[in-house]
A protein has these predicted regions:
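A short acidic, Gly/Pro-enriched loop at the edge of an enzyme's catalytic core
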Residues: 8-20
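A short glycine-rich, Lys/Arg-flanked "PGG" loop and its adjoining helix->strand segment in the class I
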Residues: 35-47
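Conserved Rossmann-like nucleotide-binding pocket used by diverse enzymes
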Residues: 3, 21, 52
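A short SAM/SAH-binding and catalytic strip from SAM-dependent methyltransferases
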Residues: 18-32
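Class I SAM-dependent methyltransferase SAM/SAH-binding core
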Residues: 1-9
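Active-site beta-strand termini and strand-to-loop segments that position acidic
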Residues: 116-118
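C-terminal alpha-helical "lid/dimerization" subdomain adjacent to the S-adenosyl-L-methionine
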Residues: 35, 52-113
């Protein structure tokens, strides 16, 4: 089942879903909403379930698009730079951590896929 709703205030029971997918969402959210989104994702996923996050990631210093993307983010994506400056776990509530975490980056580090297991 695919559910569309306010990601920072899910109307779902605790541990009620197998998986959560956050696809290019977090860079669109102010920090307080992003924190709520990740807290809610951790809350609603069953133990052993997965949270899959795909979003921007800070590319290496020699990446040919790094300078361009910095300008794009500053003008058009004001919350995206947070994802360059912090690991995603930094936005989780204090004391909340995934049981396991795996991160892969693509296109020279410009994009990331993070999979958390609860």
């Amino acid at each position: 089942t695919l559910t569309q709703c306010d990601s920072s205030s899910l109307q779902m029971a605790d541990a009620s879903v197998d998986n959560v997918l956050l696809f290019f969402l977090l860079h669109e959210q102010p920090e307080h909403v992003r924190r709520g989104t990740l807290a809610e994702a951790m809350r609603v996923v069953r133990p052993g379930g997965k949270i899959v996050i795909v979003d921007y990631h800070k590319p290496g210093p020699l990446h040919p698009l790094r300078l361009l993307m910095t300008g794009v983010f500053r003008k058009l994506e004001p919350y995206a730079m947070d994802l360059w400056e912090n690991e995603l776990e930094a936005f989780l509530p204090e004391g909340v951590k995934p049981a396991a975490a795996r991160k892969r980056t693509w296109f020279g580090g410009l994009y990331q896929q993070v999979v958390w297991t609860r």
